C-alpha cells in the first residue's frame, strides 16, 4: 500500500456507468515521451476504437490516458499489450545499438 501522499505509477479512473472498455488511466511522473509512443502502440490493436492522452498542466508530470475498446474488450488489455510491445521495441533498439557500437569500436581498434 502506498504511503500517505505517495502516488501510484498507474491509476485507473472509470466514470459511473461506464464499462471496462472505456477507461481513463492516469500515469504519474510521465510525459510525452511515453505518452505518444504508448498511444501509437495501442492504436495498432484492432480492438481499440479510441486512444488518446493529455497532459493536464505543463507543471504536472501526469498523463491522462483514455482508451475505448470494441466488443467488450477490457481497456486494461490493450494497455498491457501496448506496454509489453513498447518494451520489446525498446529492447530491440537497445540490442541493435549495442551491437553496432561494439562493431564500431572493434573497427576503430583494428585501424590503430
From Swiss-Prot:
One of its GO terms (biological process) is transcription elongation by RNA polymerase I. GO terms for cellular component: RNA polymerase I complex; RNA polymerase III complex. It is found in: Nucleus. Keywords: DNA-directed RNA polymerase, Nucleus, Transcription. The keyword Transcription applies. Coiled coil: none annotated. CDD domains: RNAP_I_III_AC19. Pfam families: RNA_pol_L_2. It comes from the Eukaryota. One of its GO terms (molecular function) is DNA-directed RNA polymerase activity. InterPro entries: RBP11-like, RBP11-like_dimer, RNA_pol_Rpb11_13-16kDa_CS, RNAP_AC19, Rpo11-like. Belongs to the archaeal Rpo11/eukaryotic RPB11/RPC19 RNA polymerase subunit family. Component of the RNA polymerase I (Pol I) and RNA polymerase III (Pol III) complexes consisting of at least 13 and 17 subunits, respectively. DNA-dependent RNA polymerase catalyzes the transcription of DNA into RNA using the four ribonucleoside triphosphates as substrates. Common core component of RNA polymerases I and III which synthesize ribosomal RNA precursors and small RNAs, such as 5S rRNA and tRNAs, respectively. HAMAP family: RNApol_arch_Rpo11. This is DNA-directed RNA polymerases I and III subunit RPAC2. It comes from Danio rerio (Zebrafish).
